């Protein structure tokens, strides 16, 4: 289809320039994560070091963190298996017995398979924490389709209920509809073909969906279209109306529904910036939100934490590493700094 111009379309040059941010460029070793596969990996040597760290009178926390924060998640799982084969004991339980507090929590998160950690966080968000529009949406909206499928399968196995059933019972209104649609994983795949007519149709549909009983349109567009298409819709909406879609959301919705839609728009526009904002918010609380810090740093350490660091530094004028140093105390700080990896000057 032809490229449109004027208010409803972005030029080809604008399209290209919008994708040139350094925060989105893969690092020299082929990943935007801070944590890579440890090349000199030996599960047996790591097991020996961990056994030594917990066998004496005092627990060697530095040694434990040095091993766990310098191995990929797959390598940590291999260490757990090797530990069990050698000792007939569970590594996770052994470390839990030796540690306590936030350090214990971060070690548990490091040793759990990603899907198990996501399932646990999703369950906590839906059952009693009042954070469905925040944590539940984070997990459902930012995981890849295979990651989401595995998370939901683990959720059903561990808690004997479908996540969809908990969403239905614990949320309501457009928030419930958004979470259910995201949990179905029905978002269209990006084909590489730009459909400018569909983008224009979606912009018009959202403009006309500002009255009552139009929530279904918002859910459909936000949860079914592929992210690349949605970025174009958000840009064209602003081009056409003179204001961002977020302004319309704030005027049209309230409470959890408003927060959920704003969060989803943030994920669509710039996922690393979305996580940078969440990390900054977690650090600004009177007591740092350790659960949020742990969840985000661990879950993004092998995917895009370098991009998140770049967005954090650009927006807040201070590196994520320095912010963690200033706000977090104790052994937990050492673990989070190890995942963050380095200062951004």
From Swiss-Prot:
Q: Which Gene3D superfamilies match?
A: Annexin
- GO CC annotations, alphabetized: cytoplasm; nucleus; plasma membrane; vesicle membrane
Q: What would be an example GO MF term here?
A: calcium ion binding
Which top-rank group of organisms is this from? Eukaryota
Bilayer-spanning residue ranges: none
**Where does the signal peptide begin and end?**
none
The alphabetized UniProt keywords are: Annexin, Receptor, Repeat
Q: Which InterPro entries match?
A: Annexin, Annexin_repeat, Annexin_repeat_CS, Annexin_sf, ANX9
Q: Spans of the Annexin repeats?
A: 41-112, 113-184, 197-266, 270-341
Q: Which Pfam families match?
A: Annexin (PF00191)
Q: What protein family is recorded?
A: Belongs to the annexin family.
> What PANTHER family does the entry give?
ANNEXIN, ANNEXIN A9
Protein purpose: May act as a low affinity receptor for acetylcholine.
Summary of subunit composition and partner proteins: Homodimer.
Quote the protein name from its UniProt record. Annexin A9
Please name the taxonomic classification of the source.
Eukaryota, Metazoa, Chordata, Craniata, Vertebrata
